[in-house]
Amino acid sequence: MARLRIAITHSPDGDPRVQRRRAGLRKTDAQEIAEVLRRAGHKTFFVVVDGAPKCLKRLASVDADLVFNLVEGFGDDNTKEPHVAAYYDLLGLRYTGSGPRGLSLAMDKALTKKVLAFHRVRTPKFATVFRGRLDWAHDIDFPVIVKPVREDGSIGIGFSALAGSIKELMERIDELHADFNHPVLIEQYIDGREIYVGVIGNARAEAFPPVELDLSHLPKGKPRIASVEVKWEEGTRAYRSAKLRFPDDLRREVLDAIRHAALTSFQALQLRDYARFDFRITPDNKVYLIEANPNPYLYSGAEFIRGARASGRTHPETILEILELAEERYRSR
C-alpha cells in the first residue's frame, strides 16, 4: 500500500465515553492507532470532533487521503454518530468503517431486530414504548431487560435494567424517559453466556473466534448482564469479577450458528470493514443475537482485538487490514 496522509477523527479525550475505555490504559485507541499507522510509514494527524461548530469547519478543510473514523457521537449525543459519517460523505472524505445507513440501522435496536427477523436471525422478543405509546410488542414474559433503544456501550444499562415485575418495569421506563428522549426497549431476558464475535471484511467477510465475558463470578444477587458497572466502573467488585476469556467448550453446531448469525447480520445491516456482535447462548444451546456494534473499540485490549488475535492477527495487523479494506472499497467504486 502507498504511504497515505491519514486523519484520525475521534471524540475529545475528556468525553466520558473516551475516559471509560481508557481506564487502566496508558494511551487512547486514537494514540495506539496513530503509532501503528506511523510505523507502517503513513503520516497521521488528529481531528477532534467535539460538537462545536468549528470542528465542522475543521473537517471541511481536512487534507487527507483517508479518515480513520473513531468518532462516537457529536457533542454529548451518541445518536449523532451516523450524522458525522453522513457529513464525511457530503464532504467527499473517504473513511474507515460503516457509513450512515449501517450506523443508523445498528443504532436503533428495535429496527435492528426487525431487519434481522426478516433474515431469520434469532433475537429476544421485545416491545418498544415512548411516553405511554406502545410502538411494537411481542407477548413477553418476565424477567425483562429495559434499556434505551438508541444507545450503545451499555449506556443506560445498570443492574437495575433487569425488571421482574410490572412495578419494576414501570419504574425503569420512567427513569429512562427522564434521562433519554427516545423510546425504551423492553426485551426478553435471555439467561445464558455472554459471547462476542468480531467480523472483518466486506464482500468476503470473516468472523473471528468468539470471546466470552464470564459473568459467573458477579456478586451474589446481581443479574448476569453486561451492565455499565461490569463494563466501565473499574473500582467496583462487579468490574473486577467479570473476565474475558476464550471459550473452549462450545459445540461445533453452536460455533457454526454464531458465525452464521454474525456474518448474516453484518450484511443485512449494511455494515462495512469491521463490526462486533453480542450474543447470548442459552443452556440448551440456542443462539440469540443481542446487539450489533459497528466500528467497535480498537484499543489493544478490546473484545474485537482479542478476537482478532485468536484468529492469528496481531493488533497492528488488524488496524492495517481495516485501513486496507476501506481503501479497497473506494478503489472499487
Show the residue positions of the predicted features.
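Short acidic, glycine/proline-rich loop/turn micro-motifs
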Residues: 17-20, 155-158, 302-304
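ATP-dependent carboxylate activation and anion-phosphoryl transfer catalytic cores
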Residues: 115-120, 249-333
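Hydrophobic beta-strand scaffold residues
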Residues: 44, 94-95, 123, 144, ...
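ATP-binding N-terminal substructure of ATP-dependent carboxylate-amine bond-forming enzymes
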Residues: 1-96, 100-101, 105-107, 111, ...
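Phosphate-binding site of ATP-dependent enzymes
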Residues: 166-260, 283-288
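Active-site nucleotide/adenylate-binding loops and adjacent lid/helix of ATP-dependent enzymes
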Residues: 2-10, 27, 59-61, 104-185, ...
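Alpha-helix N-cap recognition
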Residues: 51, 164-165, 314
